[in-house]
Amino acid sequence: MRAATHHPLIASPADIRSGRSWPSSGRTALPSNVRKVSLVTRATVAVEQEKKVKVSLLKIGTRGSPLALAQAHETRDKLMASHPELAEDGAIEIIIIKTTGDKILNQPLADIGGKGLFTKEIDEALLDGTIDIAVHSMKDVPTYFPDKITLPCNLPREDVRDAFICLTKSSLAELPAGSVVGSASLRRQSQILHRYPSLKVVNFRGNVQTRLRKLSEGEVHATLLALAGLKRLNMTENVTSILSTEEMLPAIAQGAIGIACRGDDDSMINYIASLNHEETRLAVACERAFLTELDGSCRTPIAGYAYKDAEGYCVFRGLVASPDGTRVLETSRRGPYSLDDMLLMGKDAGKELIATGGPDFFRW
């Protein structure tokens, strides 16, 4: 298989710049103009060699939001710490790619195509060689991968819970009837309305900073954000309270970062596979098996969470709901924390909810 990484031969700029002084005895001093030409030539070579150092060995593709960039920087830092050649100045380059989901902000995600909105253009850049690896929020990654792309790495998972943010009340339960909660997530909308039918949920898009600004300007009374994102942005001071996973089951793969590359690029596979956190990878695989079985999209409120309990077993909880929250179906499983068993748990849980809900349950 072909490896796409290039390792340029780099001479040390210090070696190039170091010149020996001319001996003073037994020789005629060179004219000053010759000496200047020599210095200029040496300086030019040194600059050229410095430029060679800047040639990146690895290009990371990411969205341009502050959270996406924080995740790309986390990936870069881990690569630099694990591979000395990538710690050289300029060895890793971060390339920002604008996705469909970034361009269309005035419509609900479900109305503009659902899954793949935040990954398609990045995957295309990966396939055409513009970038070498792609950093994704796993909750944005479709259940299928494009041909010739592999995802051999999940970084350690952040906190999966949702944060409640409000300027006047400390929890959803304290909000008066008629209060407006902003959220672009049907998963959050359905669970909020199921527990608190007197509240109103409105579409609320934008990056973390934009949504916090809209909240402070009074567009909504409260909002929910993924605690993982707030932690990665060092913005947890905005959190009013944290919802338990019993009150708000997380999105599939919430808090998990995935790193993808071309399937035939052995060098990149080796780089990023070395960062893989196996416990996270298995949990994400279980949750995505559940999602795949349900054939879920952004039009279907689906939640799921797999984790290792105190005895080392996998516990999985899954949920599907109607967007208005009037119907919520839940299930759970417990079994060995191994890939085959966890894939089976996720699929089996999905089949159960399809059978329970009936074919019409998923036609919204």
Regions found by a protein language model. Name each.
Residues I16, S25-A29:
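Low-complexity, intrinsically disordered segments with a bias for serine/threonine
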Residues P108-D162, T168:
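N-terminal glycine-rich phosphate/adenylate-binding segment common to multiple enzyme folds
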Residues M138-K139, D147-L199, E246:
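A conserved helix-loop-strand patch within extracytoplasmic ligand-binding domains
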Residues R2-H7, P13-D15, W22, V34-I112, ...:
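Small-molecule-sensing regulatory modules
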Residues K59-G61, I95, A134, P152, ...:
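Short, well-ordered beta-strand segments
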